[in-house]
Structure formats: C-alpha cells, structure tokens
Amino acid sequence: MKKVISILCVIVMVLGLVAAFAGCEKRENVLKLYVPGQYIDEDIFEEFESWYKEQTGLSVKVKVKEFEEVENIQRDIEGAKADYDLICPSDYMVEYLISKNLVQEIDKSIIDISADGLVKPAYIDVMREYDPELKFSVPYMYGTLGILYDYSKTNAHVTSWDEYFSATYNGQRSVKQSIRDAYAAACIYNNSKKPAGSQLTIQQVFEDFSDETITAAKNTLKTALSASIWDIDNVKFDMAQGKSEASVALMWSCDAGYVMNTYEDDDGNEFEGNKNLWYCVPTEGGNVYMDNFCIGKYAVNTQAANYFLKFLCQKDIAVKNSEYAGAISPIAEAYDELYDYYMADEDGMFEDTAAGWKEMYIETMFPSAATLARCGVMKDIKTGKNALNAMWSDLVG
C-alpha cells in the first residue's frame, strides 16, 4: 500500500512539473533584463512586446531582474555566465566589460547611436571615454556628482569641495557610502590644493589610482568621516523632509532633482519638493556619469535585445523613463522636450521660489557645456584596485 501511494505521489509531482513548464515561455521568446531597481518604467514592456510583434512578426515576453549595485553585473556575467540579454552598467563598468569581451556589439542596422541627431553631441563625447567606437552600448540616463545643500541651514550658497570638506560642516556633512563617489570627491579636492603647475586635468584625476593619490584620498576622507554622516540611501529623503542633521551632502544630480520636485519616498508616500535644497557641481570639478544598456556575452535573444534598444531611443519612451527614474535621457528629442517642459514651468514648480532657484534646477538636470567641461568620467581601475579596496575597508571597517 505504501509503495502504491509513493508511486502515485511521484506521478502527481511529475504531472505538476509538466504543467508548470507547459506554461513557461521558450527562452528564445523571452527578453531578460538586468537593471537597477526602480530605474525603468515597466509599463513600457507590454508596449514593446506589441511593437516588436509589429516589427518582426515574433512574440517576446520581457522579464526583469533587479540588482543593487553595478558590480553585480561583473559577478553575474563574468563569474556565473548569466544569460541576461540586456544589462544596465555605468560607464566604467562598460569599459571593463568591453575589455573582458563580456558584451556583444550592437547591431547598427537596427540601432546606430552615432546617427546624426539621435544623441546629444555632448553625451556622445562622454560615451567615447568608455566605448570609443560606440559599438557596445546605448546611453540610457546621464547625471553628475556634486553637492546637495540646504540653504535654510547653510545661509550661503555652497560652490566648492573646499567648503564641503571644511570644518564648518563637521557633524553636518553627509558622505555617500560609495567607494568610487567618495574617492572622486576627495581626489578632486586634493588636486585643487596642488600648485597650479602640477594639477591634473579633471579627466586625469579620474584615471589616477597611484599609491600616493590613494593615500592622500584616504587621509582626506578619514578626517572628513570623523565628523560626517554616512549616506547609505535615504539622506536625500531625510534632507527633503527636514529630518537630517546634514546641511551638505555628496549627491547625484538625479537624486537631488528628485527631491526638489514632488516625489515619492520608498514607501510610496508623496511629498512636496523641498525648495530650500540647492545643488552644484563644485568649481574644482565633478563627475559626469552615463548609465547604459549593453547586450551580455551570454545573451540568447539578441534580436529582441537590439530592437529593445531601438525602442528605448524613441522620444516618447525615453521621456517616460526619464519621468519615472527622475533622471534625463541623452536622446536628443526626449532631452529637448523635457528641457522645454521645465523651462515653460507648466506645472508651476518654480512659483514662489528664491531668485536663481529655477536656473539652478535647470542646470542640475540639464548641465551646461561649461559645467560638463569641468567634469570627468569614471574609468575602469586597471591598476590599484586592491589598494583602493583596502583603503575603503580601513575607512568603513
């Protein structure tokens, strides 16, 4: 009797598995995306699936997995040989993936980002720092790294790293718990203190991982961190809601702009933007970053991947994703539409704001040529990675 029951249990289990797999899509009909959390409007997926059917006659289902930090891409593609069709790495990670042959070339017969007028020329220049031939990546969102400050606390405009690192803001300084961002801020600050003839260009600063530079950055950060607040994720919300002791914070422009406008916190609660918050790319220099989409080395559905890249570059889709992510697309038509929208102030965002606040916000989201000229692009660390990681371990424990 027990044997009969066991056989019946096995049959039921097998039938259950068959039924389960019968409802699964074939891998070649799935487009697998690996992206940061809350960075793409998933409402566009059904629209893409219909559009792809119209374009090719083929069916596809978009499936998404989210990562917490861009380094996960390296681990999963290089180490685990994950078969994601599309991944969303930042600039320096694109450079690394290209060097290790971990991404595939984009099919330029489907989408060619070098085509005249598709991408804003300034951001094509940014891309050439990590994808010189524009063969492996399609730009998604850009931004800068600088300083967010609460004018109601500082009572003065903050414009430099010298001010950010000064003792004036001891106990009121927020440092992003990100090795690359904190290191960049310290290196730009330290470079500005060198004699004029020995200073590096801003791009050279982002390529310097010498022992001497790492040690100097460690000393700067060690002093700063002894009287700073760590920003793991929520300082922007705390500052916007008046709950933080921070007056100045190392911040990405997209996060700064997000909490200046009407926004939702991580729990979905809506808040009015804080018009006492200001943002700057410091006079000594900053970072311009680009997040991209690439086709992974072990991708299966490369045709759908290329068509999805083309889809992302359509104006309406790029605008939707910009509005969802709180960042700005470098796709020219989307960029121009968003710029015109903010300049027209159709929703009254800039009513009753301080003199210069509108101009500051526009500059935050749409940096001028002068601002971009004092920004460098983060690079793959070819030498010095172990020393940099050791420095960070010593600092954060």
Segments (PLM) and residue ranges:
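Short, low-complexity disordered leader/linker segments with a strong preference
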Residues: 1-31
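Mature extracytoplasmic/periplasmic domains
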Residues: 24, 291, 296-371
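Early extracytoplasmic/lumenal segment of secretory-pathway proteins
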Residues: 25-100
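Hinge/lid segment of periplasmic solute-binding proteins
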Residues: 59, 65-74, 91-144, 155-162
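Periplasmic-binding protein-like
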Residues: 113-116, 143, 215-222, 270-294
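Short loop->beta-strand "edge-of-pocket" segments that line small-molecule binding or catalytic clefts
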Residues: 163-181
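Ligand-binding pocket segment of bilobal, Venus flytrap-like solute-binding proteins
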Residues: 175, 182-186, 194-278
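Conserved C-terminal helix/tail region of periplasmic/extracytoplasmic solute-binding proteins
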Residues: 358-397
